[in-house]
């Protein structure tokens, strides 16, 4: 009886969906020829990962929380000038992805 309960318990644990604490490794790439101030936000965990200048052509490795589908969502807020700012939201980010701006 105890063995049966342990087997059922193990199967239940293994059948649970992946938790949001799983991470997706990705890169943010400043493809521009100029340094840019950028705020990188993990939209699933709601945390700001970077909030300062990112040099031209620099790659910034980030670890993002994944959702139930195993994919991440990221937001980039880029200051381009006094009045020209840009917000980029990428949904469905997979492991190894490069998000460029």
Task: Mark where each language-model region is.
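N-terminal signal peptide c-region/cleavage motif recognized by signal peptidases
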Residues: 15-17
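Asparagine-centered strand-capping/turn motif at beta-strand->loop junctions
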Residues: 26-34
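Short amphipathic beta-strand segments in non-cytosolic proteins
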Residues: 39-50
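Short beta-strand segments within Ig-like beta-sandwich modules, predominantly Fibronectin type-III
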Residues: 51-55
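Short Pro-Gly-centered beta-turn/loop motif in secreted/extracellular proteins
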Residues: 59-73
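Extracellular beta-sheet/turn segments enriched in Thr/Pro/Gly and aliphatic residues
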Residues: 82-101
